[in-house]
């Protein structure tokens, strides 16, 4: 999805402390970490993320989203990227809503930091 061309890549995901991820809200963070590495573009500073990612690349609501936004703000993240549905209901400010993973990659990853990177 999103033109990342990962079919020829070995992708390993390591969770800090060896924890097990069972929260679907972590899907978006994992996907953005992989995209960030592949595209050599960091996540924009001050942005936390939370959404379930469907097999078609659609972003789905994550449980307790409003609580997650408040917690992210308390930890110093002024913005939270998530599903458009969650953000449309959010009372807290600084919510960036997206319909798809591709939209989120374009909206949340910083522009390439150097000319002539390895990937287009």
What are these model-predicted stretches?
Residues 1-120:
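Peripheral, non-AAA+ core regions of ATP-driven protein-machinery
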